[in-house]
Amino acid sequence: MIHFSRSLTRLLGELKKLPGVGDKTALRLAFHLLKSPDNLTALAESLLEVKAGVRFCSVCFGITEDDPCHLCSTERDRTTICVVEEPQDILAMERSRAFKGRYHVLHGALSPLNGITPGDLKIAELMKRLESGAIREVLIATNFTVEGEATALYLTRLIKPLSIRVTRLAHGIPLGSDLEFIDAATVQRAVEGRSEL
């Protein structure tokens, strides 16, 4: 068995916490960084900068350096909210240039098998935003997975009694896929072909 220094062992352990990074990839990344001290320093500084300056928007819960974020503070359509699972889903929607409203990030999807309930998501915050009376449409853009569909159905049941139009991205995005990996043209068609729930 190979023994590494305490600091290298710690680095490997931290790298393996990243999604898709196992033992071999962590080792490859660590040695790459060690071969280039300038890159290692730049990465460390960048991580500290993100930790100090990036936070969640107090309105939509997207990622921002300013609060509220630029999407909440601009003159976008204030009558429509697009609900997404994760902050990176906003990027997919924005790449399509098809949606002109505001966003709301749930930070996950309902998954009783994994212990994720409505209280674990930003659903109460969404409902509070809807109480203002200014919102006329909620576009549900959760992923087309079992969890995403369950979340969409749950939200629809909560929102419909408020007499707010509830729409869903058109099916055209493959089932079982994550929104962040869909190309801009497909997202645009899905937004334009959204349907009433």
Curated annotation (Swiss-Prot):
A zinc finger (C4-type) spans 57-72. Keywords: DNA damage, DNA recombination, DNA repair, Metal-binding, Zinc, Zinc-finger. SUPFAM superfamilies: Recombination protein RecR (SSF111304). One of its GO terms (molecular function) is DNA binding. SMART domains: TOPRIM (SM00493). One of its GO terms (biological process) is DNA repair. Residues 79-174 form the Toprim domain. Pfam families: RecR_C, RecR_HhH, RecR_ZnF, Toprim_4. Belongs to the RecR family. HAMAP family: RecR. NCBIfam families: recR. May play a role in DNA repair. It seems to be involved in an RecBC-independent recombinational process of DNA repair. It may act with RecF and RecO. This is Recombination protein RecR. It comes from Geotalea daltonii (strain DSM 22248 / JCM 15807 / FRC-32) (Geobacter daltonii).
